[in-house]
Amino acid sequence: MAMIRSLLFISIAGMTVAIAALLILLVFWAPASVPWAITVVWCRHAVWLGRVICGLDTQVEGLENLPDEPSVIMIKHTSTLETYWQVAVFPKATWVVKREVMWVPIVGWAMNLVLDPIFINRGSGRSAVKQVIAQGKKRLADGIWVTVFPEGTRMPPGETRRYGVSGAALAQQAGCKIVPVAHNAGDFWGRRSIVKRPGKIRFCIGPPVDASTQDPKATNLIVQDWIESKMREISVLYDDEQEPR
């Protein structure tokens, strides 16, 4: 039954995201608020669809922790759900993503138009960090939040690795705060998994971390400690002895 429900969800979500992406491309001439509104509507629809069809009930904790000013979001990446959940919940944000995404037909093009992402080559090391800082500062100055997946890729549920420093370095140079986010979406919708198992998914937004007054490496450790500690609390797949690789 879970497989049937999951395939139904994938089919409907796939059709509707294609429609939304085409609409976005058709209104490329409109003010930026129009394609963004289409994106938010689809993301909320997808969250609703997951709840109705697959029993993926989402619970948000810590909304009061969101700063009033644009900030850097550092969020755990274990599933697909968190990518559109955050669009439905957070203020307008762009993402730091691998450059291959821009070449995905229709959806990738629409994403490029709506989010104006910070595309990086993950293998370019320091050059990628410089890209994130330079482009991220421009987005923040324009009032747009910046989302960073600090592990650099989607991790198998229950695993972690050392966090990249680009998010903390950007926040320091932009003089803004970091909002850490942990969630257990991977427990129910794992990486590369077709089956979505019903359950309560907790998205936990932590207290903002002021990155402007300390070394990015120190800030990174504070953020990583909070996220990984919260993951051990909310995810049944986490090993208490798990250490970053």
Residue ranges of predicted features:
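Membrane-anchoring hydrophobic helices of lipid-metabolizing enzymes
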Residues: M1-S71
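Non-catalytic C-terminal accessory region of glycerolipid acyltransferases
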Residues: M3-I4, K130-R245
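Catalytic core of membrane glycerolipid acyltransferases/transacylases, capturing the structured
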Residues: I24-V41, R51-I53, D68-G125
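Active-site phosphate/pyrophosphate- and oxyanion-stabilizing loops and adjacent acidic/basic residues
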Residues: W48, Y84, A168-A169
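Short gly/ser/thr-rich secondary-structure transition/capping motifs
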Residues: V52-V60, V129-K130, N184-D187
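Short acidic-hydrophobic, aromatic-tinged amphipathic segments that line or gate anion-handling sites
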Residues: V60, I118-N121, A211
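Generic preference for hydrophobic
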Residues: V60, I73, W95-V96, F203-I205
